[in-house]
Amino acid sequence: FDTILVLNFTGAKEFKIFESFLRNKHFNSKIEGDISFIKNFFFNLNFDVNQISLRKLLFRFLPENETPVVLNSGISKKINGTIKISMKHSQSFIGRINDLNMVLVFENGDLRIKNGSAKLPHDSTIEFDLLFADNSNSPFLDFSLNFYSQNTKKFLRKFNIYRSVDKETSLSAKGKINLRSNKIKFFSIVSDKSEKFDKQDVLKIEKNFNQNVLNTGILGATDFFKLKKFANELLN
């Protein structure tokens, strides 16, 4: 896991970072921003990502069938600041993803991902907010997702789903994943802005997701074949 970090900066206790970069076999990014050591360690950085192998990078820190390092040690409460991440494009199991943007907020041991957004294939978009917190040694991931597609039929074909659907579809979901038990709990699922899923449907989706996606850990949420199986059992 060889990593090259080059920092060019000016300043003493407050540093201005410029023309810097972080590179390894999974990640390549330009870096600029500010770092301060006055009173406490604080940073405000911009990462302009040129290349990323997200799933491989996640496997480094969240290996399947092992207790993830982050769950053993947590995130230091001394790490506070923000990292704005932008990426023009990346390849994924559903095709090319464009204009990926998000803000990582580190605050007293919690990690929040705010204002996440990306353009997906077939005129589809996703917006997301995430919160990772270690609450009394019970780490969890809160999530809020908003998906919209102007060509739902073509998008679903990526998952070998050929059922008749409306051309335009929206779906919003909020919930929590227990990172110890690898179980998901949905607070709400709403389709096409107003149709809220009833309790029985939500329980069915939770059971399906836990059995087919999270059965080997949180990284199942990035596994195309697991997501494909989940979607097929749910929609076919």
PLM features: residue spans?
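Membrane-proximal interfacial segments on either side of biological membranes
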Residues: 1-236
